[in-house]
Amino acid sequence: AYLKEKGLVKNSTSYYMRIWRSVYNLAVEQGYTTDKKPFKHVYTGIDKTVKRAVPFKIIKMIKELDLSFEPQLELARDIFLFSFYTRGMSFIDMAHLKKSNLQNGILTYSRKKTGQRLTILWEELMQEIVDKYKDDSSEYLLPILRYCDINDRKQYKLRAKQIGRGLNKIGLRLELKAPLTFYVARHSWASIAQDRKVSTDIIREGLGHDNEKTTHIYLASISTSQIDRANQIILKGL
């Protein structure tokens, strides 16, 4: 109930329940408690996620929108595109990217959700966005958070709301069937990868998924160089 009140979807709450179940089972195994089966009626499965992907032509339309007189919408659009360019990077991970995460043409970061470390070959499309919002006084790579360790949570929540509102307006303007969110960027990257004959294994690694089942949920509703090559194939034409 607590996680639901915080806005987490069923699959996310299930993910945390599976972690707690593992910890509890370990405690039982080591004799710290008896097995009272507290998770007997707790949902720990995975629901089939509704596909949110849009085709490549819609991504291109979003990129080509003239939003020069609407800076809030322009920022929202650019952060959405950066997510797509970086294989569906989540908003929280983008918000906390620092300039130090980019070294020698490689962007390296750890997913907040799983702790998994991912590397992405830096592309010109990504650099265009960074250059557009360049701020020498900030340690952050993107213009989401401005100041390190000063009301970080407050800054994050405010920017998430502003950018989310901007994406919603863009989606309405383009008359999309579903709300435009960062899930759309992630699902679209996976779907377009599949359309361009990228293997499921490479898509899975690119998304940072732990198992192939999760990847198939995205698609159906290796080496770093292979993933980077796949991303170049997906971004071609933008």
Model-predicted regions and their roles:
Residues 2, 29, 33-66, 147-153:
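Flexible interdomain linker/hinge and immediately adjacent N-terminus
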Residues 5-38, 87-89:
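N-terminal DNA-binding recognition helix of tyrosine site-specific recombinases/integrases
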Residues 53, 111-115, 207-232:
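Catalytic-site neighborhood detector that most strongly recognizes the C-terminal catalytic loop/helix
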Residues 59, 123-177:
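Active-site/catalytic core of tyrosine-dependent DNA strand-transfer enzymes
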Residues 81, 85, 89-93, 186-210:
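C-terminal catalytic core of tyrosine-transesterase DNA break-rejoin enzymes
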Residues 96-132:
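Conserved tyrosine-mediated DNA breakage-rejoining catalytic core shared by Y-recombinases
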Residues 100-108, 177-178, 198-217:
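Short, polar N-cap/turn motifs at the start of nucleic acid-interacting alpha helices
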Residues 119-124, 128, 132-133, 217-238:
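DNA/chromatin major-groove-contacting recognition/catalytic segments
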